[in-house]
Amino acid sequence: MNRALLRAAWSSGTALRAPPSVSRAAVYRSAIHPVNRSFASVSCLQSEQPSSSSSAVPPALEPKDELTGNSTSESTPHIPWYLQEEAPLAESEQTFSRDQIPELPTNPPAILPALLDYVFKDIGLDALKLIDLRGLETPPALGANVIMIIGTARSVKHLNVSADRLCRWLRSTYKLSPYADGLLGRNELKIKLRRKARRARLASRSGTMFDEKDDGITTGWICVNAGVVEETPVKKDESYSFEGFGHTATGTRVVVQIFTEEKRAEVDLESLWQKALDRSEREKQRLSQVNPGAPSEEVRASNSINVSPSDREFGHASRFPTSPLFGQKRLLHTDHRPISQKFDRAAIHAEDTEEALGSQSSSLLRDHDHSDNEKKLRSMDALFDHLSNLSDVQARIELGEGPEDHDSTLFLRLFHDVLSVSSAEEKAIARLVLFCNAISRQHPGYTKRGLYAAFTECTCAGYLVSDDLAFSVVSALLSPRLAGTSSEDVAGQVPEADQELALLVLEHLSLRGTNVVNMRVFDMIYRAVAISPSTTAPDGANDAQTGNKSSLYRVTRLIDTLDLPFEPEQARSLMLSLFQHGDYDDFWKLWRKGPLNGSLRTAADYKMLFRLHADLGDELRARDCVSTWIPMMRREDNPIPLEGELLVDIKRCLMLADPDIVQKAAEGSTSNLARFWNACQMKMLR
């Protein structure tokens, strides 16, 4: 039974030599059943020499007995490692891990401490660094007022998992809408990694090299933009000294940049932003030395358009003195300026101008008490107001022979008298307004090429051309020409060269941030297309008419596709153009769109509606119009009264719908048209 153990014991030479004082049975018993000992901290080689009085103890068993006694008397009971309690760390060692969380900046948002703890403790990002970019013009892709956190993930999988968990935590805890650039979904990442492993196995089996080029799984960099985490509590006063587009950002944004270790060393994002911060600090110091009393200004505006759910070219761009297209010196603005410009030095001759104009029978100026600031405006504004009140023929006479004519008419003499005391910017703007009026009135002495040159002169010099004035330039360029102004012109049409000039102006407006996708612009385009010669249709009147209808159809389809914002005044003008060119379906579509967009119909809308049908002369359309929309006038949120010009237009439509309406009403007819006629008659008698 214990044969193997006995064989091992008897094979030893020392075991065979038993001391004479020990019996053979004792030797067998110790060899077969060895003495059990507990572990001791004393080395097994350490033993004490036996005393002379212990000669009765066998030499072979004496060290074992002594070691056992020492272990029980001198050492504590052994505790396994998995039951041992760890000694408490020193306070310095406890705070060492907390030192990896960066310090909070001044005026941090409330979410920032919790976000740093979550990123460091729960997600496990290393080497965290916080960069406060709220004093910089950050790229629009990040948004304004950014606090950036940079961290390192341990692997590609950790990178994706960290970004995914961070987005879910921001959504569930703070109800934010973060987006992560470069993040793959959980299932998508698993599928791509599985496919990559399969390709590697197939390559190893076939003995070919596996191409480890960029497979689109990850770039080693994920940018988590949490968006606006805190709105600015104090609302700042708006400044109108700059121009541009979009809205001024007021909230603080937090962006978390997560890298793998290799990608972070390659990009070195901290150094790039630190250089930008250093440049900004040097610029502030330079400005403070030039003008110590002037406060530092920060202009930070975001894109978007329409924007995006989160704000969506690039970098801290210096403001060039010229625009990309015309070399325009420009600032940023958030509000429109009026068309009229302030002619400060023109106030010197304001009273003389009024006396000269007051002697005319047309009475160019009205006698009102004006303040000093208004006097600076009224001399030039009064001239253009007087011009706008004249008919086209009279206006062309007042404008003289052309831009080189300075004194042939009283209007030109007064105009150039005001220009003589104006600044260079005021002169350029005034000439541009003069060209717009002349081209719109189809004056043969003023060319559209000259109008475009005047506009280019203003933009290249960096003068402030308001959006309204720029749109007036586009409208003038798209207006029809008179016959005979040049050899290739056709009466009542807009040549392709004029259309190209208008598109250049629209392109400039778009580049400087003006919204050109609106009903006002499409109304001008629609009118120009309707009177433009067809370049795609073959010869012949019918073919040309078919080509124009096709072009108009494309414009209306584009309007429907873009779903333009509804502006009542612009929509009324566009509806007028649609109806006048026979596009009745799109007219009614736009007519019904107003209340759906929260725009109530007014008396001006109904006046336009009934006047258009009365001028059209279509009996069926007139009958449908009065039968449907006269009752609707009383059902509007603000009921439309039957009075004034509206009443006259309704009576015209009624007479067109039923030529015998007067006789039927006198005979006591009870038809709807007769009742409408009687109601109109009663309103007129009151």
Curated annotation (Swiss-Prot):
Residues 48-59 have a biased composition (Low complexity). It is a peripheral membrane protein. Residues 48-77, 280-319, 352-372 are annotated as: Disordered. One of its GO terms (cellular component) is mitochondrial inner membrane. It is found in: Mitochondrion inner membrane. The keyword Nucleotidyltransferase does not apply. Its main location: mitochondrion. Keywords: Membrane, Mitochondrion, Mitochondrion inner membrane, Transit peptide. Residues 1-39 form a transit peptide. GO terms for biological process: mitochondrial gene expression; mRNA stabilization. It comes from the Eukaryota. InterPro entries: Atp25, NT_sf. Signal peptide: none annotated. The keyword Transit peptide applies. Belongs to the ATP25 family. PANTHER family: ATPASE SYNTHESIS PROTEIN 25, MITOCHONDRIAL (PTHR28087:SF1). Probable mitochondrial mRNA stabilization factor. This is ATPase synthesis protein 25, mitochondrial.
